[in-house]
């Protein structure tokens, strides 16, 4: 599979790429900004939640700076509230791998392709989600926001994964993500393959604009894409029109 394309490292997003996520990210942001008086039913809440959706994939600290640009104290307080709310939400949620995710990881490993999970979320969230989904032992490397100077859309998470995995060249790397920030990070890293998945919060057009070389419906379509060197059955080439699958969200 992966070795036919020369891919030796697959950098996958977490929630919405490998792991199903039924809105817990945005609900956690809603809880966090409510601690700062921005509550449901107000225009301020609607405006900020629209900003949250657009900024999905970025580090929580960066998102809060976007939401409270003129008040550092409120931004930091909201970030702390988010960092408490999300692990609690994961602990209460039924976290499962997306359909086909486990099989894809097994096929990548069988093809001698190392697997890294990258996220702009905190390490505690990364570990909790991987443990809950039963994926952690299938992954070679994990990189969270604490491990890098900058989260997505900067390329730091991807580049750190490359360094830790000791890949020979960036052309041997595939980045798979469902947010425009994650896809842009893959493009800026120079990765040979940058795949947008439609199980995340952002539509195909936005993923293409961010630099996706291919668009696939879900992680389950990755083996055919990498193995054949062509778009997987049912996938949308990066230059073609595509529609959004409204099933999940990604970080």
Q: Which residues does each PLM region occupy?
A:
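Non-catalytic pre-domain segments flanking phosphatase-related domains
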Residues: 1-12, 232-246, 250-251
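N-terminal helical cap/lid subdomain that shapes the substrate entry/recognition surface
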Residues: 3-102, 107
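Short acidic, glycine/proline-enriched helix-loop-strand junctions
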Residues: 150, 156-158, 171, 203-241, ...
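Conserved Lys-Pro-Asp/Glu-containing loop-to-beta segment of HAD-superfamily phosphomonoesterases
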Residues: 152-180
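Acidic, Mg2+-coordinating phosphoryl-transfer loop and its flanking beta/alpha structural elements
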Residues: 174-214
